[in-house]
């Protein structure tokens, strides 16, 4: 993939400040050795997430000034509905403040439908790989989240184009094991964040939908990074090279019945999400019923009118092919720099981040001492760069036994915000991590000082193990 320069001009900048090592040592200790608890002023380059951290365009900012803040029936809501139908073909839209808001109004409705319509008793959701908040919402509502991602996802060194794919045999086996009446939904996560921002092929999405249809199970598309997934399909899958991103997106969403979206990723807004349903009026009404007490009235769902307008415009900008080429190329550039420096990563690189294989860099730190978290802390001390753990810490404990689950992958995610950093920043990141690798054997594992019962990685506190 030939890299291109940024397909935009920079109109506004925000100064960032390098701190001293002594400053960073104090800041990290005060944060309980958890990068989530660092103050942003103490961070030089912030790679914690691409969620809500991108730069909006002049067109989106112009839309902000056209916000209709009517409590009910905002024109910006209808602009958003029009954009949703244009891209996805779904007619029913409920806004939410972000992706987890969409999940918390949809999942209980799916569980209720499983019990009342399907006669099920034990709610189960199956995904290629549930992300943390998705699994958290399922478990908080008494459900079980099961992942059936392809085995190739767990081999970080072997190139494979579709490391986000479902293992179709495991999918069928899981449905049969738990009984189709207990399966609330199959969740297709595009791209698959927990396996390294890896794409799902169109063929796999189609096959999953065929299996779901056979068993009468609805399919939810977790759509945080659907544009990046569409771009990978165009680049890698036979028969799609000459199709537009719009055409590919429209076909992808034929293989789903509804979607949840954190719009803070591909549409490049700072806040917002939505739950959209193809045409199931009864389910739509159930979601609306939960929206009012949980998120807000059904035509704003926790979002200001101005933010809905920015989101409607961002749906178009995120699907621009020139932007996507630049976006994926920048992530790939960082990945190649790291590989040249001997850093093991999930390969090929995914769409929104480079995932560093911390288990290979820190083989002396066991999974229950969180090697990827230790590497995140060391990178912050080295260069003021904030990354995030995707491994056993995020995976959590078995809800039935309380035992720590060992993740198949211990990854440090270097998440690249959209339209924010240049390749000079990528070089700085690569140089810092390559330098850190030379003293990786000195790093220590971590143990909890405070462990929250749910989604613990956000607010947990740690100490180093001597």
Curated annotation (Swiss-Prot):
Enzyme class: lyase
Entry keyword set: Lyase, Pyridoxal phosphate, Tryptophan catabolism
InterPro entries reported for this sequence: ArAA_b-elim_lyase/Thr_aldolase, Beta-eliminating_lyase, PyrdxlP-dep_Trfase, PyrdxlP-dep_Trfase_major, PyrdxlP-dep_Trfase_small, TNase, Tryptophanase_CS
Transmembrane spans: none
EC number: 4.1.99.1
Residue numbers bearing the N6-(pyridoxal phosphate)lysine modification: 265
Keyword Oxidoreductase applies: no
Cofactor: pyridoxal 5'-phosphate
Subunit and interaction comment: Homotetramer.
Name assigned to this protein: Tryptophanase
Taxon lineage: Bacteria, Pseudomonadati, Pseudomonadota, Gammaproteobacteria, Vibrionales
Gene that encodes it: tnaA
């Amino acid at each position: 993939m030939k890299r291109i320069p940024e397909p935009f001009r920079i109109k506004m900048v925000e100064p960032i400040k390098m701190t001293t090592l002594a400053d960073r040592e104090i800041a990290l200790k005060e944060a309980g050795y958890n990068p989530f608890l660092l103050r942003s002023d103490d961070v030089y380059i912030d790679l914690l997430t691409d969620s809500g951290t991108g730069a909006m365009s002049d067109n989106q900012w112009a839309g902000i000034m056209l916000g209709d803040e009517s409590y009910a029936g905002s024109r910006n809501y209808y602009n958003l509905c029009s954009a949703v139908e244009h891209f996805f073909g779904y007619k029913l839209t409920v806004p939410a403040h972000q992706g987890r808001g969409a999940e918390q109004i949809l999942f209980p409705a799916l569980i209720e439908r499983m019990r009342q319509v399907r006669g099920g008793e034990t709610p189960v959701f199956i995904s290629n790989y549930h992300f943390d908040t998705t699994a958290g919402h399922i478990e908080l509502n008494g459900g079980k989240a099961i992942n059936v991602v392809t085995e190739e996802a767990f081999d970080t060194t072997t190139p494979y184009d579709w490391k986000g794919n479902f293992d179709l045999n495991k999918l069928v086996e899981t449905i049969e094991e738990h009984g189709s009446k207990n399966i609330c939904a199959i969740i297709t996560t595009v791209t698959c964040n927990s396996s390294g921002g890896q794409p799902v092929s169109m063929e796999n999405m189609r096959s999953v939908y065929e299996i779901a249809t056979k068993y009468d199970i609805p399919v939810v598309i977790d759509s945080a990074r659907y544009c990046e997934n569409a771009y990978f399909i165009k680049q890698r899958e036979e028969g799609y090279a000459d199709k537009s991103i719009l055409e590919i997106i429209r076909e992808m969403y034929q293989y789903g019945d509804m979607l949840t979206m954190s719009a803070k990723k591909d549409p490049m807004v700072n806040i917002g999400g939505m739950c959209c349903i193809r045409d199931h009026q009864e389910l739509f009404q159930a979601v609306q019923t939960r929206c009012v007490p949980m998120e807000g009235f059904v035509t704003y769902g926790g979002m200001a009118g101005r933010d809905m307008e920015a989101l409607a415009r961002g749906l178009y900008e995120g699907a621009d092919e020139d932007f996507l080429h630049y976006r994926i190329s920048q992530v790939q550039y960082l990945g190649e720099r790291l590989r040249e420096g001997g850093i093991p990563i999930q390969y090929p690189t995914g769409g929104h981040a480079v995932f560093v294989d911390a288990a290979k860099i820190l083989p002396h730190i066991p999974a229950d001492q969180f090697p990827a978290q230790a590497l995140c802390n060391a990178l912050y001390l080295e260069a003021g760069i904030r990354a995030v753990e995707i491994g056993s810490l995020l995976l959590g404990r078995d809800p039935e036994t309380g035992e720590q689950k060992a993740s198949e992958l211990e990854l440090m995610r270097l998440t690249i915000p959209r339209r924010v950093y240049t390749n000079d920043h990528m070089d700085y990141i690569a140089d810092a991590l390559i330098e850190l690798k030379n003293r990786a054997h000195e790093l220590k594992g971590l143990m909890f000082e405070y462990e929250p019962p749910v989604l613990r990685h956000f607010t947990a506190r740690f100490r180093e193990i001597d």
